[in-house]
Amino acid sequence: MDAAGRGCHLLPLPAARGPARAPAAAAAAAASPPGPCSGAACAPSAAAGAGAMNPSSSAGEEKGATGGSSSSGSGAGSCCLGAEGGADPRGAGSAAAAGAAALDEPAAAGQKEKDEALEEKLRNLTFRKQVSYRKAISRAGLQHLAPAHPLSLPVANGPAKEPRATLDWSENAVNGEHLWLETNVSGDLCYLGEENCQVRFAKSALRRKCAVCKIVVHTACIEQLEKINFRCKPTFREGGSRSPRENFVRHHWVHRRRQEGKCKQCGKGFQQKFSFHSKEIVAISCSWCKQAFHNKVTCFMLHHIEEPCSLGAHAAVIVPPTWIIKVKKPQNSLKASNRKKKRTSFKRKASKRGMEQENKGRPFVIKPISSPLMKPLLVFVNPKSGGNQGTKVLQMFMWYLNPRQVFDLSQEGPKDALELYRKVPNLRILACGGDGTVGWILSILDELQLSPQPPVGVLPLGTGNDLARTLNWGGGYTDEPVSKILCQVEDGTVVQLDRWNLHVERNPDLPPEELEDGVCKLPLNVFNNYFSLGFDAHVTLEFHESREANPEKFNSRFRNKMFYAGAAFSDFLQRSSRDLSKHVKVVCDGTDLTPKIQELKFQCIVFLNIPRYCAGTMPWGNPGDHHDFEPQRHDDGYIEVIGFTMASLAALQVGGHGERLHQCREVMLLTYKSIPMQVDGEPCRLAPAMIRISLRNQANMVQKSKRRTSMPLLNDPQSVPDRLRIRVNKISLQDYEGFHYDKEKLREASIPLGILVVRGDCDLETCRMYIDRLQEDLQSVSSGSQRVHYQDHETSFPRALSAQRLSPRWCFLDATSADRFYRIDRSQEHLHFVMEISQDEIFILDPDMVVSQPAGTPPGMPDLVVEQASGISDWWNPALRKRMLSDSGLGMIAPYYEDSDLKDLSHSRVLQSPVSSEDHAILQAVIAGDLMKLIESYKNGGSLLIQGPDHCSLLHYAAKTGNGEIVKYILDHGPSELLDMADSETGETALHKAACQRNRAVCQLLVDAGASLRKTDSKGKTPQERAQQAGDPDLAAYLESRQNYKVIGHEDLETAV
């Protein structure tokens, strides 16, 4: 098969040190060849692949497999080459002969030497037995798994090849070529390992990182990496092959010394001590689907090598390498050249010549396979937008997608890429840059006249981004995970955007000699956002002219903003635009607006297509009950005409709006002097002219949906929980910057702020208001004499309350991603639901927070609200408290207080064995299903935080027995930690137990109480999957419908490296 189908590449491991290293080495040998290979051809090389792990002990024993299979492969990537011989079959034979000689030599030695040889043989036999036992993994047998001996490597002739940093689209493109980027990472070891690293003793050697498969090597080791034939994941397939085309992609396995997430097979994490400098291979992951497995025989198995890759959570938007074909250059054979040529007509010659010109310089073609589930995505990134953001975004998209669907606009325009992909069905486009980048792509789409036109989404970089704000993409990219962005583009709604023509002619009312200095045409003849003239265009023009004259003075965004402010103030004092109304004539759909413009003396006139203008302001506002005007839309075929005075321009920044003049389909504008104008932010000074504005067409755009389409409908009473009980934790900027790639450490460093109970469909904008109210309650509580009551504790404790409030700059953090925490832009909070970023707790980042305690040792947080010391609060009654929360939709339970006397009371409670007779009575009552005995024992002082002989909680027992009344009593009176507490042996929660027993009533009680539907047991199974295994598809469907949102990571376990 071709290289696009098979990509299993693992790094060479160090030689095994004795028999104890054999299992790890054999486990790491799980790979398939990078070149043409079949399953049958891989099988004979089992021993060769395993023996390569320890050449010192198995070179002689494995000579048959190594030497015999060296000629069965073909091409540079053949899987059957010898471990020591490389591409030369003689190398394998030499190594085999040397090993055989090493076994025969002790025959002529003394008895002591014979004993040593016998002992050595026994060690070798032991290793061979282990290798044979692990044949399921080692049979893949990649030749590059073996550490190549420096003396056996061929010497390269000629100068060293420069590492490639960009994709090669020429006919010389090599499949599986790495894209090397300079990196300064110091924690990652060289991918070759200590045995093969060329500069392993140099601490400051230059390193490079592949943007596609994320491996890091020294610059001096790149040549060695090529010699062992370690390839990157394939991005295309070779054309001209007579073999049947495979419509699937195989995994591209890569060794990882550091790995986030959990193993796909066993569900356990990749935990290791001192992981930052670890030299051990802990995981094997696929750089396509991001699945990861432990480097163990029991986790990574043979069928993983041969099975097709699903391409992971983003398979619907990834362009498979099997679609992209490199066409071989046709060569005229001798037989064809001697054949008599037929005469062709001039028309046919011209047609053929035109086709050759069209295909000239295009060695690649796209042959897609149509599917209604596929929405292939093209990503265009402008690295110059947003400082250094564009470059980082470009690299992240190359990691998640096929690099040949990600394009750098600084290298080449979008035309060639759009032409290449023009026949791909359901195509979508993501423009990463400013509004100018979006306009550029839309203009090319107009030029190519694609039908149907692919919709365009926007990832805003830089400042401004009014179109991105209109389409709900926000005002700028913060650090939202690229995985979520891909989901949003895939699930986004396709809407239309009006686009308007600007037709410019010289003013016919003025003689040629009266035309003043100025350009005769606008910088753009089409606009998507706005077209304006007057004050705002004059300020923008001054900035552009000054930057062109002195570009070195405008290399700072802060300086640019200061210059804008200074230019605006200077223009305001000079009143250069005060006479604008005297030199223009505006006619909208036959209505002359000139008298009104002259009456109100506007200094700025804006023709607005979208609601946003000037970095997010809304100049049209909300007409409300004004019957003359309609609310503004970007797809209604009308353009809004707005006038501004200096006062209304100033009010615009604080929520004001301009003077609404008209909503029309056509505008005729005449100017009688040179006036500054701007088209979508591109300024000029236009000579007196007649400008006609008319509707051009409508472009398809991707609007970011407020929720994923895969989420349950909000109006479905069975799909969204009535309320969510969520703990709020705050994190300092210092901890966030230090631990944002280590979720566990960051969780430990967070400080609990309090607990909210909100509606199930609450969004973050509303949740922000509740958190601010929580702060107010905290301050009011701190002013009085209070006592804090802890659940399951009869005593109350006086407390000194924390007076540190949240700063106004705090923001939400998304903790649902597999690799790290991400900040959420405040302007996009209304687009996110609480349950989209929360797994029973919310994290917020406070940049002004002062850390008052060491990270990782947060004290306990009370579960109940603070009550007055003089009496008992109604909140102490669990049933009444539950009813109050459900009625209000919001409850504040227990703000967090700091006290050194209570740091031993952890909010993460630990179960204890029964110590009193009441505890034993409670345990027996729950197991027997005796509710009355349970109530009596609990009133007599028994604890609900006890465990049975098998380390299960009371809620586990109640869920297993299926007694709904006991489950309800424990939920009402027990601590909240019991709800999602996992069994120490199986990792199952109470919901897992109930699902295994197919007890629907208990499952409903637990789900209504807020039990997590996404927690997995030790085998990686959710309660829904347990119900499916138990043979209750109705219960499984119910649990699936009640899930808060679709989990991206558990199916494919996206893992960061």
Curated annotation (Swiss-Prot):
Record function comment: Diacylglycerol kinase that converts diacylglycerol/DAG into phosphatidic acid/phosphatidate/PA and regulates the respective levels of these two bioactive lipids. Thereby, acts as a central switch between the signaling pathways activated by these second messengers with different cellular targets and opposite effects in numerous biological processes. Has probably no preference for any of the diacylglycerols in terms of the acyl chain composition, especially for the acyl chain at the sn-2 position.
Q: Which GO terms describe its cellular component?
A: axon; cytoplasm; cytosol; dendritic spine; glutamatergic synapse; nucleus; plasma membrane; postsynaptic density
- Domain of life of the organism in this record? Eukaryota
Enumerate the GO terms in the molecular function aspect: ATP binding; ATP-dependent diacylglycerol kinase activity
UniProt feature, compositional bias: Basic and acidic residues: 1014-1024
Subunit relationships: Interacts (via PDZ-binding motif) with DLG4; controls the localization of DGKI to the synapse. Interacts (via PDZ-binding motif) with DLG1. Interacts (via PDZ-binding motif) with DLG2. Interacts (via PDZ-binding motif) with DLG3. May interact with RASGRP3; involved in the regulation of RASGRP3 activity.
Subcellular location, principal: other
What is the name of this protein?
Answer: Diacylglycerol kinase iota
Enzyme Commission (EC) number: 2.7.1.107
Give the ANK repeat ranges. 950-979, 986-1015
List the residue ranges of the region (Disordered).
15-74, 334-358, 1014-1033
Residue ranges of the TM segments: none
Q: One GO BP annotation here? A: platelet activation
